Amino acid sequence: MKSLAKLKSEKGIWLHDSEMPTVGHNDILIKIRKTAICGTDMHIYNWDEWSQNTIPVPMVVGHEYVGEVVEIGEEVRGFAIGDRVSGEGHITCGHCRNCRAGRRHLCRNTSGVGVNRAGAFAEYLSIPAFNAFKIPDNISDDLAAIFDPFGNAVHTALSFDLVGEDVLITGAGPIGIMAAAVAQHVGARHVVITDVNEYRLDLARKMGASRAVNVAKESLKDVMNDLGMSEGFDVGLEMSGVPAAFRDMLDKMNHGGKVAMLGIPSGDVAVDWNKVIFKGLVIKGIYGREMFETWYKMASLIQGGLNLAPIITHQFNIDEFQQGFDTMGSGQSGKVILNW
């Protein structure tokens, strides 16, 4: 079958003829329709230090997708041939304390689709049926293909009550922008997002952010004054992984504020812990999506009128994959879809 795989320990990704995946007793086989390029895929493409230490070569990559069930393992219940599905990319062990307590997003033995096992950038994908999520008929293939990163945004944004609150989001990548849209949709008062990429800040404005701030040109404090905010932000969503952005967030938080962190710093981060202590801040780390509460919330948000369509800015056929990766790497895009 046709696939996109990491075949060499160097920058790049290659179109490859891979073997069909096997289907176990508890698995389903999915014929892929659309996939989306993730930041993780870009790390693997660029073959950075994390990728070199994590990704076995060769490896079919990719974990954002939508497709159709074409084969079902003999022990599988609840799925039928023809079901349209996306899926949770974190394969959990099922036997650790957190898994057994229903907190599978905190499994200490997680295996990643397209990272530790064969991924979705292929004509077919086999995953445990437990990890598949049926897509409602009134949600498009395009939106279903980005449910994985949308789930990161939803998990982060809905970690704390946002109704009537002032929200600061640092990092206007696709996930940060979707988090801004979610915060606005569920009733936040002011949603302010920061970055230095004008293309993505403009996209954030289109997605409903109250203010999209280029911190290289504009003071966040001035923006707060313009909005009549005298006490600081109630909720912070750190999506950038940039130490300076996190420190600025802590400085601008109100006393008793709550911070959810999804962005991954490249190294150690120096923090003024006095601000955390004396402001009484709560900081929560976010990894992946809650299984499967986040997934049901995603579908409900879209069915309830949340418009994510503007975040999908480019589409390419799979034979044009190089153009897709170049576009994603340019920083001048939202989500990039590859059609199979």
Swiss-Prot record:
- PROSITE patterns recorded for this chain? ADH_ZINC
Q: Where does Zn(2+) 2 bind?
A: 93, 96, 99, 107
EC number(s) recorded for this UniProt protein: 1.1.1.103
Q: Which residues form the signal peptide?
A: none
Please tell me where Zn(2+) 1 binds in this chain.
38, 63-64
Q: Which InterPro entries match?
A: ADH-like_C, ADH-like_N, ADH_Zn_CS, GroES-like_sf, L-Threonine_3-DHase, NAD(P)-bd_dom_sf, PKS_ER, Zn_alcohol_dh
Q: How, per the record, is the cofactor bound?
A: Binds 2 Zn(2+) ions per subunit.
Alphabetical UniProt keywords: Cytoplasm, Metal-binding, NAD, Oxidoreductase, Zinc
Q: Where does NAD(+) bind?
A: 175, 195, 200, 262-264, 286-287
Q: What pathway or pathways are given for this protein in its record?
A: Amino-acid degradation; L-threonine degradation via oxydo-reductase pathway; glycine from L-threonine: step 1/2
How does this protein assemble? Answer: Homotetramer.
Classification via NCBIfam families: PRK05396.1 (NF003808), tdh (TIGR00692)
Q: What is this protein called?
A: L-threonine 3-dehydrogenase
Q: Which organism is it from?
A: Pseudoalteromonas atlantica (strain T6c / ATCC BAA-1087)
Gene of this entry: tdh
